[in-house]
Amino acid sequence: MKRLIPCELLRRGRALLYPSGRDPPPIGGREIPSVFGNTTGLKSSQTARLERLYRRKVPPSELVTPELARALTEISREITRQVGLLIDRGGTVRAVVVGTDREIVIADLDQFVLGRKKLRGIRCLHTHLKDEALTSDDLTDLALLRLDLMAAIGVLPDGLPGRIFLAHVVPPNPEGRTTEA
């Protein structure tokens, strides 16, 4: 005997999986990818501004463009949360992540397989609301997730970019360090 699942249960299950009401974008699809992380309480205009960050490109030889740094710090100050970008080696924004005022939780990195490579080919660029240096959590994420680079842009009181702090993974060394800031 076949059991039918009522549509209401399907809708509830879908709402639990995707609280925003939207399915995640298909891989390789044309839809604008979702913003990950702590997006509850954001206005639709703020979510739209965060989604537009996916359209930005960074020259592969640069860490960040001045325009992108300003866009990141302005939205971060407005929503009073850290905002992070995962950028690949080609300069394409692959994920936009919203955190709390103190930290971001990096999205699932399964699509960036390590394989034989030592690093994932992804750099994390995020904001710090108090214009502070990289935290121990940032350095731990850098080392354990095998990111190419971890950078934090300080947000000044007027929303402009402040100092930029960065760290990268170092090869095996006598001191036993895994990162260098």
Tell me what each language-model feature is.
Residues I5-K117:
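Glycine-rich short-loop/terminal segments
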Residues G28, T40-G41, R49-L50, M150-A181:
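Active-site or metal-binding loop neighborhoods of secreted/extracellular toxin and effector enzymes
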Residues T80-G84, R120-I122, L147-L149:
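Short, surface-exposed beta-edge/turn micro-motifs
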Residues G84-L86, V93-V96, L142, M150-A152, ...:
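Generic structural hydrophobic/aromatic packing signal, biased to beta-strands
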Residues I87-G91, L129-K130, A152-L160:
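Short, flexible beta-strand-to-coil junctions
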Residues V96-R146, V155-L156:
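Short HxH-centered metal-ligating active-site micro-motif
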